[in-house]
């Protein structure tokens, strides 16, 4: 029996690290390949469920491997994570090249290149996170003559070339910047002595590189100037929202709803430029994860996250063999300043792998193993709790959305009474979804259930900042004879997005009501509708202007 126990311990000593490494990287990394075309692309329910489910398996495996053989587990996990991420990065790059060539379909009607993602931005961010790993592997195997090193060198080179060939086509400035910063980090970590010597001997060359960098940044800005100005405005208004409530949201509202209210206050109370009004929108994300976390959960949570990431970066900085994973983390941190990678499960899987590798290396530095195991155990328990909760959340949401999809056909076909009846059955399950709440409220408005429509649309205001909700609230109040309330809602809509013509058109119709007629206000709003420069001069704009002219003619004010 004793011999058998010794043999079992030796077997576990050898096998558990590999089991932890393979399970961890294969299952978590595979999140990027999980898709379900039958669901709305922005839900990503299947990916969240997959990632949550596999984390309940891999976290205990990681803990067991660390307890049995910490050094070997950390080493194997680090190596397998890098190679698996490069493998999935190569698959994504090939998929993207196939989409450019027309072999594979895109997942977005407006973009040719998306990979397995629904948008080229997250797709490019994923590739940007893998790129520094491939660069690091090339550097460490460069010049080595043994067969295994040569094979690894050329495999890494293939991955790097594939990513570099497709990354520019994604047109994601955030991903480009993350790639440059993270690859620069890897070069500095591997060749820091040579870089330091080069800088001291070739200062003018370094100055030239800095000037080129500034030119690159300027070109990236002017390439999509309105988009860049819009992001700056989002950051400005998000910061104001944080200043109003630094402890985070207490009423369960989403970022979109909080931002919509903050933008409305900004355009009401502050002096703003015409360019700000022109680029204003209704974003679902802050395009800066640190700011968005501060808005939703409080500044302290954002500071805690940044602190953890900086500690992990310091761990990577203390060990040269972690330069690749350190570059991966740097890429993700930079990308998070300009995008929303924590809302994309495939990129969250890369975050998790980077954190697991670097935290594992940090735990090995702790001299007393029992302290390290205690820390790891608490992390695993917290991770398991979060995984179970997230799986339950997205499992319920996915089931509800599957029930909603066939019913939604009624709404889009104009059968509003039947749609409202079916939406009522799903309301408790779907009240978190902004499109569902808007459609349900509009269907109730169309069927004359104005009181109920107002209740549902006010709920929609807690999950969305879209001013169209205010427009429907205004129309509903007008139809029910509550003209002052209708005016309040429509004026709020004009302040939320000042460049929108539609709410001004609705105000023209409101002020033309015999019971609420106001000549001065009617003329003011009519002049805006007739003279404003719309972003898109569509048929709808021309029809609204013609109707306004008819109203003015009827009131004998032309």
Question: Language model features by range: what are they?
Answer:
Residues 240, 251-295:
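Interfacial juxtamembrane loops and adjacent helix segments
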Residues 412, 446, 479-480, 513-514:
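Register position in tetratricopeptide repeats
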């Amino acid at each position: 029996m004793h011999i058998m126990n010794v043999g079992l311990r030796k077997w576990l000593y050898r096998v558990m690290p590999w089991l932890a490494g393979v399970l961890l990287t294969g299952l978590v990394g595979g999140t990027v390949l999980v898709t379900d075309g039958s669901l709305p692309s922005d839900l990503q329910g299947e990916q969240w469920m997959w990632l949550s489910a596999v984390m309940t398996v891999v976290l205990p495996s990681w803990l067991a491997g660390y307890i049995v053989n910490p050094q070997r587990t950390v080493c194997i996990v680090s190596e397998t994570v890098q190679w698996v991420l490069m493998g999935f990065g190569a698959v994504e790059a090939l998929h993207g090249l196939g989409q450019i060539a027309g072999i594979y379909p895109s997942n977005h009607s407006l973009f040719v290149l998306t990979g397995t993602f629904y948008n080229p931005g997250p797709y490019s961010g994923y590739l940007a996170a893998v790129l520094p790993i491939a660069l690091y592997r090339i550097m460490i195997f460069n010049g080595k003559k043994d067969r295994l090193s040569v094979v690894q060198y050329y495999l890494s080179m293939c991955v790097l070339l594939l990513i570099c060939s497709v990354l520019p086509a994604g047109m994601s400035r955030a991903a480009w910047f993350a790639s440059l910063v993270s690859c620069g980090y890897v070069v500095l970590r591997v060749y820091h002595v040579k870089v330091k010597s080069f800088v001291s001997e070739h200062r003018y060359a370094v100055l030239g590189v800095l000037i080129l960098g500034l030119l690159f940044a300027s070109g990236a800005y002017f390439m999509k100037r309105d988009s860049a100005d819009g992001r700056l405005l989002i950051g400005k208004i998000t910061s104001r929202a944080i200043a109003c409530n630094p402890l985070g949201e207490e009423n369960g509202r989403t970022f979109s709803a909080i931002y919509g209210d903050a933008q409305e206050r900004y355009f009401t109370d502050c002096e703003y430029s015409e360019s700000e009004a022109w680029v204003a929108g209704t974003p679902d994300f802050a395009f800066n994860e640190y700011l968005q976390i501060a808005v939703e959960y409080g500044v302290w949570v954002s500071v805690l996250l940044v602190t953890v990431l900086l500690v992990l970066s310091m761990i990577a900085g203390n060990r040269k063999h972690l330069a690749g994973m350190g570059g991966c983390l740097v890429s993700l941190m930079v990308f998070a300043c300009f995008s929303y990678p924590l809302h994309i499960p495939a990129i969250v899987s890369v975050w998790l792998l980077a954190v697991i590798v670097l935290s594992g290396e940090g735990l090995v530095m702790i001299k007393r193993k029992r302290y390290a195991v205690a820390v790891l155990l608490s992390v695993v328990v917290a991770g398991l709790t979060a995984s179970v909760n997230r799986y339950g959340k997205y499992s319920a949401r996915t089931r509800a959305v599957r029930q909603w999809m066939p019913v939604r056909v009624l709404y889009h076909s104009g059968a509003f009474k039947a749609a409202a009846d079916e939406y009522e059955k799903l309301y408790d399950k779907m009240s978190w979804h902004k499109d569902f709440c808007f459609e349900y409220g509009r269907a109730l408005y169309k069927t004359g259930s104005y009181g109920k429509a107002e209740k549902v649309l006010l709920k929609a205001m807690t999950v969305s900042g879209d001013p169209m909700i205010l427009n429907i609230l205004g129309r509903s109040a007008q139809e029910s004879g509550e003209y002052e309330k209708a005016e309040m809602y429509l004026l709020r809509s004009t302040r939320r997005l000042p460049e929108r013509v539609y709410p001004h058109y609705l105000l023209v119709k409101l002020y033309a009501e015999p019971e609420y007629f106001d000549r001065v206000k009617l003329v003011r709003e009519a002049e805006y509708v007739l003279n404003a420069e719309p972003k898109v001069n569509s048929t709808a704009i021309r029809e609204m202007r013609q109707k306004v002219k008819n109203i003015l003619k009827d009131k004998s004010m032309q």
